[in-house]
Swiss-Prot record:
This is Dual-specificity RNA methyltransferase RlmN. [4Fe-4S] cluster binds at C144, C148, C151. Residues 7-26 are annotated as: Disordered. S-adenosyl-L-methionine binds at G200, E201, S232, S254, L255, H256, N335. The gene is rlmN. It comes from Acinetobacter baumannii (strain ATCC 17978 / DSM 105126 / CIP 53.77 / LMG 1025 / NCDC KC755 / 5377).
Length: 410
């Protein structure tokens, strides 16, 4: 019996609105949660207030996790009343909260109008040389359009991009979950690291993701170190170049194959941006003027698929591919999902693969699988608490049809 703790909202199918949707047109309010400092400064000037109020309000929202303007005690009563009339601070609705026996936490959020769509966020705790680390894996889209063959999220299809308040709301809620019983004056930020590795391709929702990361780095909000915010991409090359100009954060590449033929199968966007272009973009990202610690290397993510990309020749090809790219390699044991066409590489195979890379001088780690008891491990970010999306159902039907054809041919 699983020891995960599941806390559900009272009405799974209720009509509570998300952060980006007002209760009614007449009651429409401006949601301040996803606004950057520059946006908040303009907002306050537009309503006839001094722009320094932006920093004050940001601190109350993102450092003390306050949603009631009446609690913002360093702001005049008149301004608080004004904000109450025209503004709100509203994160996406939490449908379920899952707490794993290993400390992993997962939130299922409802976003969009009416019953909306579901997205998931996972927090993974760990101990390192700096102490207790809490890494939050944030989603950027509802579903994903890239359809990587080993990823369960992609099999849901793509529905829409998340808004900045829906993205930053995931970080807000994760922090608040540790502080909700703590007096406001004693609250502190708990999440130490953010990885944009959840549902969706972050670089295909570029503006909203960029705005959200600026809030993460802002000292008036979460004040996170640039090296503690990581964006993971499957390889949208033009946007990698744009990212290098717009913000300094750590970059991770969902590589998963050491040659174009195999990567075309596993990560279809490779057909548009093949490996030579992707590696060159990574080199440009690292070499960008103004390089700081966040850009000293690129993290390479490599899911280990039994008999597919885990053979000795694949390790040798990977060494050749990465020889001129400062990188750290993270080997990820595959997490099977229903109808998945792959299996997980054996532990011995993964260790052997790691040894080949380490012996060649690369820093190579094996990701510890966490949160399996709550379907929170990487590749399992699917909405299992509600009906499958229409596209997921269609995909399952196609799988069944293919299996039937194979049986009849056999």
């Amino acid at each position: 019996m699983s020891s995960a703790v599941v806390v559900s909202s009272e009405n799974l199918d209720g009509q509570q609105q998300s952060s980006s949707t007002p209760a009614s047109p007449a009651a429409e309010k401006v949601n301040l949660l996803g606004m950057s400092r520059a946006e908040l400064e303009k907002f306050f000037e537009d309503i006839g207030e001094k722009k320094f109020r932006a920093g004050q309000v940001m601190k109350w929202i993102h450092q003390y996790f306050v949603t009631d303007f009446a609690e913002m005690t360093n702001i005049s009563g008149k301004l608080r009343a004004k904000l109450e009339q025209i503004c709100e601070i509203k994160a996406p609705e939490v449908v379920h909260r899952h707490y794993s026996k290993d400390g992993t936490r997962k939130w299922v959020f409802r976003v969009g109008e009416g019953s909306g769509s579901l997205v998931e966020t996972v927090l993974i705790p760990a101990e390192d040389k700096t102490g207790s680390r809490k890494t939050l894996c944030i989603s950027s889209q509802v579903g994903c359009a890239l359809d990587c063959s080993f990823c369960s999220t992609g099999k849901q299809g793509f529905q829409r991009d998340l808004t900045p308040d829906e993205i930053i709301g995931q970080l807000w809620m994760a922090n608040y979950s540790y502080m909700e019983e703590v007096p406001v004056a004693e609250r502190e930020r708990s999440v130490t690291n953010v990885v944009m590795m959840g549902m969706g391709e972050p670089l295909l929702n570029y503006d909203a993701v960029l705005s959200s990361m600026h809030i993460m780095l802002d000292d008036f909000a979460y004040g996170m170190s640039k090296r503690r915010v990581t964006l993971s991409t499957s390889g949208v090359v033009p946007k990698i170049d744009q990212l290098a100009k717009d913000i300094d954060v750590a970059l991770a590449i969902s590589l998963h194959a050491p040659n174009d033929e195999l990567r075309n199968e596993l990560v279809p966007i490779n057909k548009k941006y093949p490996l030579a272009q992707l590696i060159a973009a990574c080199q440009r990202y690292i070499a960008k003027d103004g390089n700081e610690s966040a850009r000293k290397h690129v993290t390479i993510e490599y899911v280990m698929l039994e008999g597919v990309n885990d053979q000795p020749e694949h390790a040798q090809q990977l060494l050749k591919l990465l020889k001129n790219l400062p990188s750290k390699i993270n080997l990820i044991p595959f997490n099977p999902f229903p109808h998945a066409p792959y299996g997980r590489s054996s532990r011995n195979r993964i260790i052997s693969f790691q040894k080949t890379l380490s012996d060649a001088g690369f820093v190579c780690t094996i990701r510890q699988t966490r949160g399996d008891d709550i379907d929170a491990a990487c590749g399992q970010l699917v909405g299992q608490v509600a009906d499958r999306t229409r596209r997921a159902e269609q995909w399952q039907k196609k799988v069944a049809q293919r299996q039937e054809i194979l049986r009849t041919q056999g």
